[in-house]
UniProtKB/Swiss-Prot annotation:
Cystines in this chain: none
Record-linked SUPFAM superfamilies: C-terminal domain of arginine repressor, Winged helix' DNA-binding domain
Name of the coding gene: argR1
Entry's family note: Belongs to the ArgR family.
Top-level taxon of the source organism: Bacteria
A GO BP entry: arginine catabolic process to ornithine
Function: Regulates the transcription of the arc operon, involved in arginine catabolism.
Source species: Clostridium perfringens (strain 13 / Type A)
Entry protein name: Arginine regulator
Length: 151
């Protein structure tokens, strides 16, 4: 597959998502096929991830795919987090993040700038960050989110 084919496929996917209510990947595969593009579910899933297209739940319990606008700050945070974090653990209201030497302050600042209301604050040293969460449930959710950035 050439980059041109991939770019064309991405363009068609974007047009379909923006013009139609697509609730399932199977529906999108059918729409692509009608446009002359054959794609496997695995390839489509990768494309959706690369294009920041997510399946969102709405108040009426409807799910559909939408394009998210992930800004440069978030991308930069994810890259730095992934390359700098050695380990992460949690206990009740706290998440402990162990980083490469000198990276804790930067990552702590990134976490603070996310503006997540579930986080009360961070304390950073040379290679360690303590994330203080507002509830045990928030700790578990944030831990999963931060831990998934390491993959």
């Amino acid at each position: 597959m050439s980059n041109l084919e991939k770019s064309l496929r991405h363009e068609v996917i974007l047009d379909i998502i923006e013009s139609k209510c697509i609730c399932k990947q199977e529906e999108l595969i059918i729409e692509l096929k009608e446009c002359g593009i054959n794609v496997t579910q695995a390839t489509l899933s990768r494309d959706l991830h690369e294009m920041n297209i997510i399946r969102k739940s709405f108040e009426n319990h409807e799910h559909r795919y939408i394009v998210t606008k992930e800004d440069k700050f978030i991308k930069k945070f994810k890259n730095i987090f992934k390359s700098s974090v050695r380990s992460i653990s949690m206990q009740e209201y706290f998440i402990s993040v162990n980083t490469l030497d000198g990276m804790a302050s930067l990552i702590g600042e990134f976490i603070d700038r996310l503006g997540d209301g579930r986080i009360a604050g961070t304390v950073a040293k040379k290679n360690h960050i303590l994330v203080l969460c507002r509830s045990v449930n928030a700790t578990q959710q944030i831990f999963k989110e931060l831990d998934s950035l390491r993959v």
